[in-house]
């Protein structure tokens, strides 16, 4: 034969050459080749056919690999349009993945993180990779297609490493609770905020010229005044709110001083369902702020009244009466996280999960649960400003009473009263349009399983396009690294565990006005 065997050629030729035809012999050698092949016999011809089959198989495999790596990119981009990346499950980290997808659906929280990191990450001594706010911001922006990545699945293990640096022992191989992780994140962000410098920057001329509390100046050893930083309330995260606690004596109607407590999420118990009637989110909120009687509370006013009725020589004991206590929402956050308590206990002390469906809606009016000061006007206010009840600390009355004739009350309605989510970016229901504290649903976290094991998934809105300011009406179902489109009716029929709402301005109906309200 006039050329090397195919097997020898294939060993000496580069791998890329396998995709092209082998070098052909001179024209005069064809006859000798044919004669030689006839002399080889059946076994030789079979061997040559196997060699040619091997070359064809290698070429086909390389062609398929090239197509997979470079060919379908445009198709994948077309398919991913409107979708978001999924998150890799690192063992049992579905609780973290579902929470991150829910947080990524809240634009106000991402904007706050961006502003927070730009102001304070240069003021701390820790390196940038140790900042929870920086790590969380990059991850949430990537989940909203704002980081320019083409990865369909992201790895959230850097977040676990940062939390461990904050001394949180979170294992990726043990099932955790998404609501508990939410409070771990918010408390760690507050710790990061509190570690910033406690004096005003020299280039902060406004704070130096007009200090908020000049009477509380701090003096160093040289007696040079160091002005305090502005109030930390200005840098609170968007989930931060305040509760008011009001107690009134049932005997003398004396009202104790108002107390304020902070919250990052509203943890609502699920009331017992009435036969034939569904449980609604409105009922859970009403149950949260319902009055309760507190017995054996010392009433200073009753003690004074009793002391005035007895001679001075006799000692006066503190009068204990029954007080009525009620909670109200003193400050509503920009982003509202609602936790539905699905843990209950059997008579034997075993944990049980409540699987009742709680009806919720796309829009949530919170005016009836808001604390208002006596004489405070109920006129509409912009969503990005605090009301007088949020700024004052004096006593006051309860919020507006519930109108029993309203057909819709935060989930207590039939589907005929639900505003179609695909036709209008803003609500058209009268209760919603007249609300001063209106919220829009952004994400729902659902837990499948029992109290001992299960899986978390998330329903969330698809991020709005870069050239579009209105909120997207496309909903997604996300389970770790699996992302698919879904419809809003599937979202409403889910058994919610965490609900993420974001405050909007209800009395505006034009896109230009909504863009101004969202700034």
UniProtKB/Swiss-Prot annotation:
Catalysed reaction equations from the record: Thiol-dependent hydrolysis of ester, thioester, amide, peptide and isopeptide bonds formed by the C-terminal Gly of ubiquitin (a 76-residue protein attached to proteins as an intracellular targeting signal)
TM spans (from-to): 53-73
Membrane topology, Cytoplasmic segments: 74-519
Domain USP, chain residue ranges per copy: 85-504
Places the protein is found: Mitochondrion outer membrane
Residue positions of the active site: 94, 455
Disulfide bonds: none
InterPro entries found in the cross-reference section: Papain-like_cys_pep_sf (IPR038765), Peptidase_C19 (IPR050164), Peptidase_C19_UCH (IPR001394), USP_CS (IPR018200), USP_dom (IPR028889)
This protein's GO CC annotations: mitochondrial outer membrane; mitochondrion
Stretches of the chain found on the membrane's Mitochondrial intermembrane side: 1-52
Main location per the UniProt record: mitochondrion
UniProtKB keywords: Hydrolase, Membrane, Mitochondrion, Mitochondrion outer membrane, Protease, Thiol protease, Transmembrane, Transmembrane helix, Ubl conjugation pathway
Gene3D superfamilies to which the protein is assigned, alphabetical: Cysteine proteinases
MF terms (GO), sorted A to Z: cysteine-type deubiquitinase activity; cysteine-type endopeptidase activity
Listed EC numbers: 3.4.19.12
Top-level taxonomic group: Eukaryota
One GO biological process term: autophagy of mitochondrion
Region (Disordered): 379-405
PANTHER family: UBIQUITIN CARBOXYL-TERMINAL HYDROLASE, UBIQUITIN CARBOXYL-TERMINAL HYDROLASE 30
Similarity annotation: Belongs to the peptidase C19 family.
Its job: Deubiquitinating enzyme that acts as a key inhibitor of mitophagy by counteracting the action of parkin (PRKN).
Protein name per its UniProtKB record: Ubiquitin carboxyl-terminal hydrolase 30
Source species: Xenopus tropicalis
Gene: usp30
């Amino acid at each position: 034969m006039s050329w090397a065997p195919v097997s020898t050629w294939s060993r000496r030729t580069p791998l890329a050459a396998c995709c092209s035809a082998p070098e052909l012999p001179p024209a005069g050698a064809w006859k000798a080749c044919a004669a030689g092949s006839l002399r080889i016999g059946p076994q030789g011809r079979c061997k040559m056919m196997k060699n040619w089959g091997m070359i064809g198989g290698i070429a086909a495999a390389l062609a398929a690999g090239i197509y997979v790596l470079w060919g379908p990119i445009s198709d994948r981009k077309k398919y991913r349009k409107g979708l978001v990346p999924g998150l890799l499950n690192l063992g049992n980290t579905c609780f973290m993945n579902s929470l991150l997808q829910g947080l990524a659906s809240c634009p106000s929280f991402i904007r706050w993180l961006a502003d927070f990191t730009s102001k304070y990450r240069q003021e701390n001594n820790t390196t940038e990779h140790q900042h929870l706010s920086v790590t969380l911001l990059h991850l949430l922006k990537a989940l909203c297609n704002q980081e320019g990545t083409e990865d369909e699945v992201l790895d959230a293990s850097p977040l676990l490493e940062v939390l461990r640096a904050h001394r949180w022992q979170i294992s990726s191989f043990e099932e955790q609770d998404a609501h508990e992780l939410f409070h771990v994140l918010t408390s760690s962000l507050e710790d990061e905020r509190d570690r910033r410098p406690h004096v005003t920057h020299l280039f902060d001329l406004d704070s130096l010229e007009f200090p908020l509390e000049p009477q509380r100046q701090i003096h160093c050893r040289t007696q040079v005044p160091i002005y305090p930083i502005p109030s930390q309330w200005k840098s609170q995260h968007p989930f931060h709110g305040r509760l008011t606690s009001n107690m009134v004596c049932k005997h003398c109607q004396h009202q104790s001083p108002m107390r304020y407590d902070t919250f990052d999420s509203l943890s609502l118990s699920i009331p017992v369902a009435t036969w034939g009637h569904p449980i609604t989110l409105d009922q859970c909120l009403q149950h949260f702020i319902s009055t309760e009687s507190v017995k054996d509370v010392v009433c200073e006013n009753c003690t004074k009244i009793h002391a005035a009725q007895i001679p001075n020589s006799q000692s006066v004991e503190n009068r204990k009466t029954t007080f009525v206590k009620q909670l109200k929402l003193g400050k509503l956050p920009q982003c509202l996280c609602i936790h539905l308590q699905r843990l209950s206990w059997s008579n034997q002390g075993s944990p049980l999960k409540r699987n009742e469906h709680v009806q919720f809606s796309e829009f949530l009016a919170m005016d009836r649960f808001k604390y208002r000061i006596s004489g405070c006007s109920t006129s509409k206010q912009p969503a990005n400003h605090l009301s007088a009840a949020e700024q004052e600390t004096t006593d006051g009355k309860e919020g507006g009473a519930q109108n029993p004739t309203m057909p819709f009350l935060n989930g207590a309605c039939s589907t005929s009263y639900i505003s179609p989510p695909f036709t209008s970016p803003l609500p058209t229901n009268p209760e919603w349009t007249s609300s001063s504290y209106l919220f829009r649903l952004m994400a729902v976290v659902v837990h499948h399983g029992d109290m001992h094991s299960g899986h978390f998934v998330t329903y969330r809105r698809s991020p709005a396009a870069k050239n579009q300011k209105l909120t997207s009406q496309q909903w997604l179902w996300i389970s770790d690294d699996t992302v698919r489109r879904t419809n809003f009716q599937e979202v409403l029929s889910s058994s919610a565990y965490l609900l993420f709402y974001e405050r909007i301005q209800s009395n505006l109906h034009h896109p230009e006005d909504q863009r101004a309200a969202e700034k």
